Amino acid sequence: MKAIKTSLAALFLTIWVNSLVFAQTASTRTPDVPFVPTRPAVVEGMLELAKVTKNDVLYDLGCGDGRIVITAAQKYGATGTGIDIDPQRIKEATKNAEEAKVTDKVNFKQADLFETDFSKATVVTLYLLPAINLKLKPILMKQLKPGTRIVSHAFDMGDWKPEKTVEVDGTTIYFWTIPAKK
C-alpha cells in the first residue's frame, strides 16, 4: 500500500511539474525575428524620411536595443515607446536610455506586438521580416490614425506600395502614410 501511495504521489508531482512547465511555455513566445541592430546611418535615414519632430510619438515595433527610439528622443526631442518580446532586449534598451539620459522621453515594453495597442503613435518604425510586416499591416491600418507615418528598414508591405523609398548605406528604407478611413 505504501508503494502505491508513493507511486501516486510521484505521478501527481510529475503531472504538476509538467503543467507548470507547459503553462510557462504557453504564456511566453520566442521572437519571430532575430535581433539585428540597425546601423546608425540607417536609423538617421529612417527618422529623416519620417520627418520626426518634437511633437511626434514614435513606436518602434521590435525595438531591440532601443537605438531608434533613443535617437528620436536625443536628436528630435520626440517621445517614444519601444516594443519587443525579448526581455533581454528590453533590459538592454532601458539601460541604453538611462545612459543616454532620455528616460523622461522614452520607455520600453516587453510585449507581443500583435497584441499591443500602439494607436497613440504618429510614427511607427519597423525592422521585421516580410511575413511579419504583412501580418502586421491590417493591425497598423486598424489602430493608427490617418496621417501616421510608417518607416520600414529593408522590407516592404507586399502590395501596399510605399510613397517613398530611399537607399541609405546599401539598405532600402520604405515610407508609407496611413490613409484616410473609408
What are these regions (language model features)?
Residues 119-135:
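A short SAM/SAH-binding and catalytic strip from SAM-dependent methyltransferases
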Residues 87-120:
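S-adenosyl-L-methionine
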Residues 79-84:
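Conserved SAM-binding motif I beta-strand of class I
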Residues 66-70:
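Glycine-rich SAM-binding Motif I of class I
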Residues 131-182:
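C-terminal substrate-binding/active-site "lid" region of AdoMet-derived donor-dependent transferases
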Residues 7-20:
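Bacterial N-terminal signal peptides
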Residues 21-54:
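Class I SAM-dependent transferase core
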